Amino acid sequence: MELNVKTLEGKDAGKVSLSDAIFGLEPREDIIARVIRWQLAKKRQGTHKAQGRAEVSRTGAKMYKQKGTGRARHHSARAPQFRGGGKAHGPVVRSHEHDLPKKVRALGLRLALSAKLKAEDVIILDNLVAADAKTKALAGAFETLGLTNALFIGGAELDSNFKLAAANIPNIDVLPVQGINVYDILRRGKLVLSKAAVEALEERFK
């Protein structure tokens, strides 16, 4: 499969061949969903915490005598049914991470790339290089290309001017090829790959 290559100025810069093993798969929502759940679970801090009845600062003495009052039997005011009592089965500090086989993660990435290409949301640029770290100039180039919501994937080393200039543009993300992931691909409208990124992906999955 061949796609046209463009420059940041919108000019043609030849063609590039894309591997069907990476960009030509039939998308599977179940695999993609599993990978995204795995990614988001890893990102969770897990620092949520509620005090249980053993942890609240309150006397543990019996509230009133057992018999003779006509009221319900109670012991400590730390019990969860009372205002200020401990939370029953509340959240505790923990890790939300879970395992996902490496082969499934790799397949999920190829499926996400294939889904973007099938939706005609993949653009190939010859390189991601900016002459100056000027946001205004780069934003104008993106507007010319019709890129208002996009993920840019460069080579192993990003051009510092391009990265700095793109940092202040809303809805634009820039990552090196080793940072490419399913969640970021799907959360942005367009996927913009440099020729170096395409070569690195094909080397990674061959």
UniProtKB/Swiss-Prot annotation:
Tree of life domain: Bacteria
Keywords, sorted A to Z: Ribonucleoprotein, Ribosomal protein, RNA-binding, rRNA-binding
Listed Basic residues bias regions: 64-77
Cellular component GO terms, alphabetical: ribonucleoprotein complex; ribosome
GO biological process, one term: translation
Quaternary structure (record): Part of the 50S ribosomal subunit.
Task of the protein: One of the primary rRNA binding proteins, this protein initially binds near the 5'-end of the 23S rRNA. It is important during the early stages of 50S assembly. It makes multiple contacts with different domains of the 23S rRNA in the assembled 50S subunit and ribosome.
Name of the protein: Large ribosomal subunit protein uL4
Highest classification ranks of the organism: Bacteria, Pseudomonadati, Pseudomonadota, Alphaproteobacteria, Hyphomicrobiales
